[in-house]
Amino acid sequence: MLVSVIVITYNSAQYVMQTLESVKRQTYKEIELIVSDDCSSDDTISICNSWVNKNKTIFKDAKVVQTPSNGGICHNYNYALQQTKGEWIKYIAGDDILEDNCIERFVANIKPNIFLYTCITKHLQNETGKIALYSTRIPDDTAWKQARSMLKYLYCINGPTIFIERNHLVETGGFEEKYPMIEDWPIAIRYTTSGMRIGIVDEPLVQWRIYGNSISHSNHSFAISLREAWYDYTMRFCWQYFLPLHLYHHWLNHWLLKHSKDGAFIKLFGYVLRCVDFVNVKRKIIPFNNEPYRLVKQSEL
């Protein structure tokens, strides 16, 4: 079975060689490698082209492509998806690392009617080189319980852990480009609320590089837009799926984040609200009716 490994890059010259070498070391050999660059302004493209030319015989196919314009993570994901031939897709950012047995273990754990998998993450601290394990924290349970858990505890699958079936991803519209910098949260909620549970591979298979000044943890404009998109998607879901306490929880968290310097009280209120079990009054999965980004209106329930 052919697996397409997609290395997503944007100004990744400093670390992309480490990523590519980790793909090269995979114990699973039926791999198509695609490096998809989102219009980098550094030497990423030349570095990747040089590496691929030297190592392309290792793979079933290998190439470097570039998006027509800089459109963000999800746009790059979808552009690369169009270039693939594999039955399954493994995405990895150009500064993250695959464990040597990553693809082999994902393939070995494929089960019928599960189209999206995640795994344990190794957090690689960029400044110190230290590694810490980070579990999925998503229950290996029904799709609805997984969706409810993600909303209740405000966590999701990590982007570097995504292993996804190609045809199903294409048929459901790919990644949601309305939120260009969030690839993991919308697709995880979309799949689980459509009745499709996420498969859990309880093994550390990827290293996710964490920066001390990571923009996702700062007041950088990128981080602000990221949080706004996360909030927008979550609030729409909570409102239209009758999750009033979730709705209040996310609104309060968002308000605190915007109106306090560091969102200092966000965890306190979050922990208090988590004492309450949030319940969907309909107690059922509401399908998307094959329209991947359309949330069902209250009048349709």
Regions found by a protein language model. Name each.
Residues N101-L133:
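Conserved donor NDP-sugar-binding/catalytic core segment of glycosyltransferases
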Residues I89:
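Short aromatic/hydrophobic "clamp" motif used to bind/position activated sugar donors
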Residues D37-I47, S69, A93:
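A conserved acidic beta->alpha catalytic loop
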Residues D141-S225:
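Conserved nucleotide-sugar donor-binding catalytic segment
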Residues S12-R25:
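Short, well-formed alpha-helical segments that are part of the catalytic scaffolds
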Residues Q66-T84:
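Glycine-rich, basic loop-to-helix element that forms the pyrophosphate-binding segment
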Residues Y15-M17, D42-W51, I97, N101:
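Acidic helix N-cap motif at the loop->helix transition within catalytic regions
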Residues W185-P186, T193, I198, P204-L301:
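C-terminal subregions of glycosyltransferases and related glycan-biosynthesis enzymes
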